[in-house]
Amino acid sequence: AVINTFDGVADYLIRYKRLPDNYITKSQASALGWVASKGNLAEVAPGKSIGGDVFSNREGRLPSASGRTWREADINYVSGFRNADRLVYSSDWLIYKTTDHYATFARIR
């Protein structure tokens, strides 16, 4: 089953400490032939979503702590170009969502 909703992915992360199996990193997707500018992820990796890459938090909109790293995952992806919905999660399991491509965040776990 594809798990790609905010609550579904957040619950999975808390329970299993990793993303669901339908997530692949940008480099894994690229190796399969994904080209972001073509919006072809669903063609080259059916049922997959992009997730697991580092989120740098350059703007400092998420809380920082010594040793904390952030990763991101696409949410609600079906096909075509990626949307603005992302789940961002920390190495100590803080989980935030953004529906406007990182402009604002709301903590959900």
Curated annotation (Swiss-Prot):
Residues annotated as catalytic: 72, 101
Main location: secreted
Record-level Gene Ontology MF annotations: RNA binding; RNA endonuclease activity
InterPro entries cross-referenced by the UniProt entry: Barnase, N1-like, Ribonuclease/ribotoxin
UniProt subcellular location: Secreted
Keywords, sorted A to Z: Endonuclease, Hydrolase, Nuclease, Secreted
Its EC number(s): 3.1.27.-
Domain of life: Bacteria
A Pfam family the protein falls into: Ribonuclease
GO cellular component, one term: extracellular region
Entry similarity comment: Belongs to the ribonuclease N1/T1 family.
UniProt function note: Hydrolyzes phosphodiester bonds in RNA, poly- and oligoribonucleotides resulting in 3'-nucleoside monophosphates via 2',3'-cyclophosphate intermediates.
Protein name stated in the entry: Ribonuclease
Source organism: Heyndrickxia coagulans
